[in-house]
Amino acid sequence: MDNITVGGVTLHSPLLNAAGTMGFGSSYADYIDLHRLGGLVTRTMTVKPRRGAEAPRLWETPSGLLNCVGMQNPGYEKFTQVFYKGLVGYDVPIIASVTGTPEEIRRMADALAELPAVAGVEVNLHCTYEEYRTLGSKAYLEQCAQRIRAAADGRLPVWAKLSPCAGDIVDAARTAQNAGAQAVVCANTYWGMALQADGSSRLGSMVGGLSGPAIRPLSVFQTWRVAQEVAVDVVGCGGIVCAADVKEYMAAGAKAVEIGTANFTEPETIIRITEAL
């Protein structure tokens, strides 16, 4: 495939992995040629290391996967000092996924801009059910704007990964665009729950995020809605397992796609789909 520019980032193809589904990439190098990815999206990073959520973190559902990983990561400095070095030789554009306060995001964006192979920053605007209940729609959108503006103050192109559950995703997309995002990703996982007969959760928290083929019709719909309302590039994400799924997102208005849960069961998914397109 020819190179393509999406949201200010030049990619090898329009097929990337979704954040959190390939770690920092090096662990997948034994299974696939990372150079053949359109781009590599890292695990979401924070300023300080996070232990993440309590186990169990995963629960398989029919055609889907519930997770509550809790943003576990070693902190961005571990990436810049250790994991980044293992990726440089693969000649793949790196999109660094980050989250945190505006000040933390600005700090990470500045540091990541010093790494030549990092081509862009994806700001994870994920919001848990509990956080959204506390914030409400207006405060959440203002938080999104502040985070995107902080990243946009840096030297790298900024993508915004939108939540499909925290209010209207179109409002969040417009907010991200107005704050300086050059692309929006539709979308993150959907809030979901898996309970035992006694009412206790099958996960370490009551509410998890649902991904996989079960959410694809929902995410295609949200991609279609957003693509009609913003001028920036749209990246579709959710439930992709084959070339037909990619074409469906493109028909909905996406310029590129991110593939997530499928990488867990078939690490070669992106390569297979690239060859089929």
Where are these regions (language model features)?
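Glycine/Thr-rich beta-alpha phosphate-binding loop at enzyme active sites
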Residues: 65, 127-139, 172-228, 232, ...
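Catalytic cores of alpha/beta
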Residues: 26-31, 105-115, 166-179, 227-230, ...
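Glycine-rich beta-to-alpha transition loops that act as phosphate-gripper elements at the mouths
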Residues: 22, 98-100, 162-168, 216, ...
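Conserved alpha/beta-domain cores
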Residues: 78, 88, 97-154, 162, ...
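C-terminal helical cap(s) of enzyme catalytic domains, especially alpha/beta-barrels
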Residues: 52-62, 195-208, 250, 256, ...
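Hydrophobic faces of well-ordered beta-strands that scaffold small-molecule active sites
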Residues: 15-19, 38-42, 94-98, 121-123, ...
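N-terminal capping/small domains of soluble enzymes
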Residues: 1-93, 99, 106, 273
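Glycine-rich phosphate-binding active-site loops on the catalytic face of alpha/beta enzymes
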Residues: 42-47, 123-129, 183-193, 239-240, ...
